[in-house]
C-alpha cells in the first residue's frame, strides 16, 4: 500500500540562494573600487598659466584624468578640453571671412567682431569694441610742418576724416586735401571672370575689390562667369587716388565692407562638402570646403575625434571596465534567478505529481485484477 505524501513545496530560496548572494557582489566592488579623491590635479587653471596659454601637462595625471573648468579660469566663451596629455582652454570660434573691421579697446584692429572676441578668449582678457572701422593712426609725430603744429582741433579733424576711408583704402595725409589711396595690385592675379553686384563683369575678384575701393562703395561677387550683358570693366586709375567728398554720407556706412576672395560654389557642386560649406577661391581651380566644427577632411567626411571626444585615461578606463563587468554579472544573475523560479520549481512539482498518479493507477489495476480472479 502506497501512502500518499503531500507534495513538497518549492524552496526557491534554497535553490537560488547561491545566485542571490551574487547580487551583493556589485555593491562590494563599488565600495572597494571607490574613486580616489582628486588631490593630485590642480583645482583651477590659474595654476597652469603659461606665457603661451593654459597648459596643465606638468601635473601628475596618473591617478585621475578628470578636470572641471570654472568660470574664472576659462572665460570669454572659452572651452576647457583635454587634448592628448594636456588640458587647455580652447577658443573655437567659427568666424566668417566678412571684412567688417572694428577697433578694440586694446588699440588693435580686427577683421570683424568675432575675431575680437576670439582674441579676448585667447588672451583671457576683456576686449571691448571701441568703434567700428579700423583703429585710427596718429596724424603726426609732433614735429609738424607748420600747418597742423599745435592745432589739436585740426589734427583731430584730419584723423576722423581719414577714418572714413573704407574698402581697403588708405589715407594719404601728404595730399592737399584728404585722399583715399587704393594701393591694390591685381597684376599677379589669375584670370577668373566674375559678375559683380554693380552689374559689371571683372577679370577676377581682385579687380572687384579694387573697384570697391576706388568707388568707396560695396561691390560684391554675385556669380561665377561674366554677366549676361558681358560688360567688362577695369578700374585702375592713373595715380591710384580717389578723393572723398561725401564724408557725412559714408560715415553712416562704416558697417559695410568688402568680402574676402571666397565665393559660394555653383549649384552643380551641391553635395561636394558632406559636413561643411563649399567655397571657391580665385587662387584654386577646384573648390574647397569649410568644415563644420567636429569634422575634417577634403570633403568634411571625417569626424575630428580629438576635438569632440576626450580619450579616457587608464584609471577611468578601469572604472568603465568594472562597471561593464558588474552590469554583465547583474544581468546574468537576474536571468538565472528568473529561470530558477519559473522553470525549476514547476517542473519538480510536475514530476512529483506524475509519480503519485502512477502509484495510484497501479494500485487500482491490481485491485481490479484480484476481483476478477475471485
Swiss-Prot record:
Required for shedding, as annotated region: 303-320
Cleavable signal peptide: 1-39
Keyword Oxidoreductase attributed: no
Keyword Acetylation: no
Cytoplasmic side: 342-374
Membrane topology classification: Single-pass type I membrane protein
Keywords, sorted A to Z: Disulfide bond, EGF-like domain, Glycoprotein, Membrane, Proteoglycan, Repeat, Signal, Transmembrane, Transmembrane helix
Domain EGF-like: 261-301
Pfam families: Kazal_2
Ranges of residues in domain Kazal-like: 90-137, 181-229
PTM note: O-glycosylated; contains chondroitin sulfate glycosaminoglycans. A soluble form (TMEFF2-ECD) is produced by proteolytic shedding. This shedding can be induced by phorbol ester or pro-inflammatory cytokines such as TNFalpha, and is mediated by a metalloproteinase ADAM.
Region (Disordered): 353-374
An individual GO BP term: negative regulation of integrin biosynthetic process
Biased composition (Polar residues): 356-374
Classification of source organism: Eukaryota, Metazoa, Chordata, Craniata, Vertebrata
Name this protein carries in UniProt: Tomoregulin-2
Glycosylation sites: 55
Matching SMART domains: KAZAL (SM00280)
Spans through the membrane: 321-341
Main function: May be a survival factor for hippocampal and mesencephalic neurons. The shedded form may up-regulate cell proliferation.
